[in-house]
């Protein structure tokens, strides 16, 4: 019985050591996930797959660091991409029926995101 306990502990230790570490969210993932929103935000097309991308992003942003990264990336994109209707951007959470813990705006203070 003692040998079984030792083997079980060893197996558990191996599982902890080799368990994959969660990857941090990147700006590339944020922009790729929200790319379907661009035509809508620029007034060139329907909402389309935007809500799916938003929901996928919310599912990926599990930590405070991930949410801050997403906020910073969204803020940068809002400043860099010409022709974005900021009112439509701010309305995406409502339209997609999701809760984003900050306003999608170039003026958002991402350091306060939890």
Curated annotation (Swiss-Prot):
UniProt GO MF annotations: lipid binding
Domain of life: Eukaryota
Alphabetical list of SMART domains matching this protein: AAI
Keywords (A to Z) from UniProt: Disulfide bond, Lipid-binding, Signal, Transport
SUPFAM superfamilies named among the record's database cross-references: Bifunctional inhibitor/lipid-transfer protein/seed storage 2S albumin
Alphabetical list of InterPro entries matching this protein: Bifun_inhib/LTP/seed_sf (IPR036312), Bifunc_inhib/LTP/seed_store (IPR016140), Plant_nsLTP (IPR000528)
Intrachain disulfide bonds: 27-73, 37-50, 51-96, 71-110
Signal sequence coordinates: 1-23
The keyword Acetylation belongs to this UniProt entry's keyword annotation: no
CDD domains assigned: nsLTP1 (cd01960)
Any one Gene Ontology BP term: lipid transport
One Pfam family from the record: Tryp_alpha_amyl
The keyword Glycoprotein is assigned to this record: no
Role description: Plant non-specific lipid-transfer proteins transfer phospholipids as well as galactolipids across membranes. May play a role in wax or cutin deposition in the cell walls of expanding epidermal cells and certain secretory tissues.
Protein family per UniProt: Belongs to the plant LTP family.
Protein name per UniProt: Non-specific lipid-transfer protein 1
Species for this entry: Solanum pennellii (Tomato)
Organism phylogeny: Eukaryota, Viridiplantae, Streptophyta, Embryophyta, Tracheophyta
